[in-house]
Swiss-Prot record:
A GO MF term: 7S RNA binding
Record text on subunit structure and interactions: Part of the signal recognition particle protein translocation system, which is composed of SRP and FtsY. Archaeal SRP consists of a 7S RNA molecule of 300 nucleotides and two protein subunits: SRP54 and SRP19.
GO annotations of cellular component type: signal recognition particle
Annotated protein name in UniProt: Signal recognition particle 19 kDa protein
Function: Involved in targeting and insertion of nascent membrane proteins into the cytoplasmic membrane. Binds directly to 7S RNA and mediates binding of the 54 kDa subunit of the SRP.
Species of provenance: Thermofilum pendens (strain DSM 2475 / Hrk 5)
Keyword field: Cytoplasm, Ribonucleoprotein, RNA-binding, Signal recognition particle
Amino acid sequence: MLKKNGFIVWPVYFDSTKPRKWRRVPRKLAVEKPTLSEIVEAVKREGFSFTVEENAKHPAYWYEVQGRVIVQANVKKSVLLKKIAENLQKIRAEQSSKRRR
């Protein structure tokens, strides 16, 4: 969805526990229950400008406050989501390596 000159990115797009109907990336690129802060970090790593709306609720999950990120990018949304998903996997790998130490 395009809004305010940007793409709306919901955490559910990257959640491996959600059905494909709501996920926008393949399960192999998805992570389990991504947080809004992880998505913001992934967007920062790509260098896109963004706006965070912390109290937003996804229409399908109206009972959960997930938040959303509005990303201004000059690429297709599918490319944007794939880049964010790859960065989310890197972020999770870094977090798990820090925990092992």
